[in-house]
Amino acid sequence: MAASSEEETDRRPIRRVRSKSDTPYLAEVRISLNLETAEEVERLAAMRSDSLVPGTHTPPIRRRSKFATLGRLFKPWKWRKKKSEKFKQTSAALERKISMRQSREELIKRGVLKEMYDKDGDLHNEEGLMENGQAVSSGSSSLPIITELELTSMAGDTCAYEVLPTSELMDGTVSEDLSSEPGSLSQDPSYKPAMLLPPKKTVGFPVDQEDTPVKQITLLKQPPALPPKPISRIANHIADSGAPVKLPCMPGKMSPPLPPKKVMICMPLGGTDFPYGPYSNQKSSQHHHTVLPSQLAAHQLQYGSQHFSTGSSSISIHPSIPPGCRVIEELNKTLAMTMQRLESSGLHGGESITKSGLSGYCDMRQVPTVVIECEDDKENVPHETSYDDSSCLYSRDEEEDDDDDDDDEDDDSSLYTNSLALKVLRKDSLAIKLSNRPSKRELEEKNILPMQTDEERLESRQQIGTKLTRRLSQRPTAEELEQRNILKPRNEQEEQEEKREIKRRLTRKLSQRPTVEELREKKILISFSDYVELADAQDYDRRADKPWTRLTAADKAAIRKELNEFKSTEMEVHELSRHLTRFHRP
């Protein structure tokens, strides 16, 4: 029975299945033919191998493609696996770091974070925590009411960074004194909160050789703030009001670190002092140092330390200078020198204008200023007169020459106006130089030009005339030149004879010129392009297919006859191949 079943399976026609080169061919064959053992599969593969004679039932043998070995070398599916492994590793490391992060309560217990108190003494819990330099927001989008920066000084005094409302900034009324003690929070719901950028790091300034605990910066919870606008945009809002504007100071990376009581003093844009009466007296009496916004921007570019955002926040720094801050004074001096060097190229011409009385080109106007107030530590401040004298070394009356626009066209307009002003300055300086040119009388008075009367001028001219006539009289005449054989005497007849002689000589040369045939005989002219022959011809219609251009039957017969004669007589052909020559029909 078993033998008969095997014969039956052998007699069945072999199905056309996948080729032998494919990997899962054994499983498919086993499923399709209901084979159970491996021996039967191998036997079937041997029947379907190359040694099998292809008959009616055997499928055609497939050839392996030339790209079959490419998978051994080029395996791009493994690259994705490597990338996914890297992503898994980084995600696992991030999850591990997040799980190891401590909560806010633990940081408060350890003393890293400090709880904030209201004015009444109630505990005010923070809602936002600074993580990795950005404020973490947990669903609520309330703006920060106030931001306080507490810094430790030598005597424990603080420098409070307060926020002014935008309504006061727009009206131009800014309170000059501090509204609250440093360290306290003002939570007044009447005014509009100000937007502030989140700082990159919490900053604690080191104290000179003291182990006092460093207070951390505390920030209320806030959404991601918009990028700050340039400082020059506030100028048009507060240009008419005479009140000084308190610009903000954002905490950031301090390099180099400055003590909190140091007054940042920058050189002004203008190179000369412009005393303006009551405004300058008011500033000197209040011990205020003004800093222009362009200088603040230059200071920010140079040190990269203090980020001034143009929201409606204010800075109030105690200007009492500790005795051990010589290094920072030197830094401020170098800052002032660099600012003066940068601004001197475009503003050194302005001094000449003011000296010559052309003061109409400068638009003197009041500008927004940073007010640095003096409150505490008054015993370290020197006397009023000496303080004013020392501040005059670094602070001067700043006035802007150009108006700034509200939009992003501020820089372009300032550049345009600066270039226009420089152009006008160049023209005016040229006019001034021409107007300052000394007259002839001044030159004569300075003995640069000799003093001459009219008679002396006439005498000098007569002397020059006599010299010229003497030189012309010394010139040789034509007779003298003829005697020296330099100038030959000529008559008209002689000149005409000379011209005739030249004509004869030329005609003789042209008549003796050889013709083309003579040159061909002498083999001087080799190719036809060496000479040109002219022939007279009548104009005719050069278009073809005319009745007189068509060949008639007689013309064609004559042409055939001429060709046959040429082939029979003039074409030299071997006698053995003469029978192969084709002649045209007559």
UniProtKB/Swiss-Prot annotation:
Annotated keywords: Actin-binding, Cytoplasm, Nucleus, Protein phosphatase inhibitor, Repeat, Synapse
UniProt function note: Binds actin monomers (G actin) and plays a role in the reorganization of the actin cytoskeleton and in formation of actin stress fibers.
Protein name: Phosphatase and actin regulator 1
Any one Gene Ontology cellular component term annotated for this protein: synapse
Subcellular location(s) per record: Cytoplasm; Synapse; Nucleus
Family: Belongs to the phosphatase and actin regulator family.
GO molecular function, one term: actin binding
Annotated region (Disordered), positions in chain: 373-414
Ranges of biased composition (kind: Acidic residues): 397-413
Example of a GO biological process term: actomyosin structure organization
RPEL repeat residues: 92-117, 428-453, 466-491, 504-529
UniProt cross-references to Gene3D superfamilies, sorted A to Z: 6.10.140.1750, 6.10.140.2130
Signal peptide range in chain numbering: none
Principal location: cytoplasm
Location of the motif Nuclear localization signal: 62-83
Subunit organization: Interacts (via RPEL repeats) with ACTA1.
Domain notes: Binds three actin monomers via the three C-terminal RPEL repeats.
A Pfam family the protein falls into: RPEL
